[in-house]
Amino acid sequence: MTKTAVVLLSGGLDSATVAAIAKREGYRVIALSFNYGQRHDRELRAAADIVQALGIPEHFSINLDLAQWGGSSLTDRQQTLPQTGVEPDIIPSTYVPGRNTVFIALGLSLAEAKGAEAVFLGINAIDYSGYPDCRPEYLATYQQLAALSSKVGVEGRPIQLLAPLIELSKVDIVHKALELGVPIAQTWSCYAGGEEPCGRCDSCRLRDQALIEAGHPELASAKGRLWREKVD
């Protein structure tokens, strides 16, 4: 019997890698993306490209205007995106209040409606340690809620929340993506709006550094490479 899983697919490197992992593990993948008012909505085109590249049969996209109330530099264009790198124990301004909690709830809804056994998430606690909704304890607590709040959970068949990258470094994720044939060049991680990665935002810096350390500087952003050359 074919297993089915919902994958929360942003269009970034992490979620694309998770989609490839789900496919390798034998799941029929249903992708779920969100247009939530993020300034980097370019990632939605990347999500569609990844769906095609990986041969994912179903892709849903939901509109959620979280930009209405702001609270994050990802949804409020009046705020400046951080460019100083991730700092331990500091929650960055790119944290979107309640975003993962809402996304996972909708992923669980889709999974239950489609008879899926799991929801795969691309959250990571190593490089994004400042995000409270990317921690293992957050995921474990949400798993309990998933079991209590759904028909299948009450019947003893709770939908599993799976985050295979949660304790991997960004370099390890790059290696995993390469191993699985993820089209890294088609993924999008930049937080800034535009058609080319800015190379300066925290997400670009983490991604580019990981690609360079993994031995693939050619996959790093062009602007990021130029900026690093000037700094060095």
Curated annotation (Swiss-Prot):
Q: In the record, what terms sit under GO molecular function? A: ATP binding; ligase activity, forming carbon-nitrogen bonds; zinc ion binding
Q: Where does Zn(2+) bind?
A: 190, 198, 201, 204
| SUPFAM superfamilies linked | Adenine nucleotide alpha hydrolases-like
> Which UniProt key words apply to this protein?
ATP-binding, Ligase, Metal-binding, Nucleotide-binding, Queuosine biosynthesis, Zinc
Pathway(s): Purine metabolism; 7-cyano-7-deazaguanine biosynthesis
One of this protein's GO BP terms? queuosine biosynthetic process
- Residues involved in ATP binding: 9-19
Does ATP-binding appear among the keywords?
Answer: yes
Keyword DNA damage assigned to the entry: answer is no
Q: Could you tell me the EC number(s) of this protein?
A: 6.3.4.20
Catalysed reaction(s) here are: 7-carboxy-7-deazaguanine + NH4(+) + ATP = 7-cyano-7-deazaguanine + ADP + phosphate + H2O + H(+)
Pfam families per record: QueC (PF06508)
Specify the superkingdom.
Bacteria
* Enzyme class, UniProt record, top EC level: ligase
| Role according to the record | Catalyzes the ATP-dependent conversion of 7-carboxy-7-deazaguanine (CDG) to 7-cyano-7-deazaguanine (preQ(0)).
Hey, which family's this protein in? Belongs to the QueC family.
Tell me what this protein is called: 7-cyano-7-deazaguanine synthase
Q: Which source organism?
A: Synechocystis sp. (strain ATCC 27184 / PCC 6803 / Kazusa)
Lineage, top ranks: Bacteria, Bacillati, Cyanobacteriota, Cyanophyceae, Synechococcales
Q: What gene name is given for the protein in this entry? A: queC
